[in-house]
């Protein structure tokens, strides 16, 4: 079928709408959900992933269930959460499913925005990549790795542990996201507060370059403006290497892996279509589409998984519940790194 996606930008969001035709029932899917989704005929997906990545997933969903018309609203982090909260206060919630990373979406878990759904595919996801109650699961995971410029750092210089980055040779040559709270909070949990704070203070003494956004940092690294990024998403490294940038990743223990949480709105206008989306996104078929976007899957039966590049190092799933202490974590991070308020 020839599709002509429409891109709009209401309220600062990118919107992708695709139109489709009629379905073949999915094996194992209950008839009630299928019939309900046919009557609903729509799915509205809020997420921060790039439009091409969302289009790939939604187009595949529509080929499987062509009785659905999907609409994609794109915004990231706090902007996405703010949009959802604003809609709720106004009584005009229009979203069915949301996907986001970081502590911001966990606030929605705490505030009761999500519906329980015991998706059959959840059983393929290990502990730490789903909650026990059935409100959310990890649609993808983003391992956080050290990244270096291969023109500026020789293999013999590579750090063997995080504290090696505090050696004099790296002074003025390091970069880090100025709001990397999820990474810090999880290091703090694993290492203990004293060790984690000592590490941040050491980075500050190294005159580390603090910049908002990992994509921008990856560009600075590729251009040689810094030699090493203390923390970066693995998918950013893979994408930069594909474009010919002289970058490589280094997995130091522990690798914190951020969760790309996916959940259904408890007031979803199209709840059955939302369940179809969750079933598809968590399935082997859906996860194999996810890994083609350079994001990682925690399913063991997915091929071409970027997560498989990380070997012999502990990969710790991010504990989203640490977001309960968001203010304290943010203030510590700013204080010990010297981030401007």
Residue ranges, per PLM feature:
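A ligand-binding cleft/hinge motif common to bilobed small-molecule-binding domains
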Residues: 103-107, 227-246
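Bacterial N-terminal signal peptides
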Residues: 10-21
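Extracytoplasmic ligand-binding site segments that recognize negatively charged/polar headgroups
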Residues: 31, 46-59, 70-88, 92-225
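Periplasmic-binding protein-like
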Residues: 127, 141-142, 170-179, 200-204, 209-211, 281-304, ...
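A bilobed periplasmic-binding-protein/Venus flytrap-type ligand-binding module shared by bacterial periplasmic
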Residues: 147-152, 188-190, 258-270, 289-290
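Short amphipathic alpha-helical coupling segments at ligand-binding clamshell hinges
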Residues: 57, 195, 199-202, 269-281, ...
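Extracellular/periplasmic bilobal clamshell ligand-binding domains
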Residues: 305-341
């Amino acid at each position: 079928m020839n599709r002509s996606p429409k891109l709009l930008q209401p309220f600062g969001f990118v919107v992708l709408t695709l139109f489709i035709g009629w379905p073949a029932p999915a094996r194992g899917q209950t008839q009630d959900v299928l019939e309900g989704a046919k009557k609903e005929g729509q799915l509205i997906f809020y997420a921060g992933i790039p439009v091409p990545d969302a289009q790939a997933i939604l187009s595949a969903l529509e080929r499987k269930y062509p009785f659905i018309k999907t609409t994609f609203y794109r915004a990231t982090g706090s902007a996405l959460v703010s949009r959802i909260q604003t809609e709720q206060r106004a009584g005009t919630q229009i979203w069915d499913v949301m996907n986001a990373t970081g502590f911001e979406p966990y606030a929605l878990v705490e505030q009761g925005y999500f519906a329980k759904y015991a998706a059959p595919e959840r059983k393929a996801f290990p502990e730490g990549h789903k909650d026990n109650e059935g409100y959310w699961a990890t649609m993808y995971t983003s391992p956080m790795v050290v990244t270096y410029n291969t023109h500026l750092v020789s293999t013999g210089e590579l750090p063997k542990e995080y504290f090696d980055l505090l050696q004099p040779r790296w002074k003025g040559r390091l970069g880090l996201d100025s709001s990397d709270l999820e990474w810090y909070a999880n290091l703090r949990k694993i290492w203990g507060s004293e060790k984690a704070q000592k590490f941040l203070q050491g980075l500050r003494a190294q005159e580390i370059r603090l910049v908002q956004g990992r994509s921008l940092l990856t560009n600075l690294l590729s251009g040689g403006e810094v030699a090493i990024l203390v923390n970066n998403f693995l998918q950013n490294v893979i994408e930069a290497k594909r474009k010919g940038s002289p970058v490589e990743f280094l997995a130091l223990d522990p690798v914190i892996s951020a969760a790309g949480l996916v959940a259904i709105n408890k007031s979803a206008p199209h709840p059955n279509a939302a369940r179809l989306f969750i079933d598809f996104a968590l399935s082997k078929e859906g996860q194999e589409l996810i890994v083609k976007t350079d994001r990682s899957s925690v399913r063991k039966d997915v091929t071409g998984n970027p997560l498989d590049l990380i070997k012999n190092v502990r990969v710790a799933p991010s504990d989203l519940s640490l977001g309960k202490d968001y203010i304290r974590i943010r203030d510590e991070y700013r204080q010990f790194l010297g981030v401007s308020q």
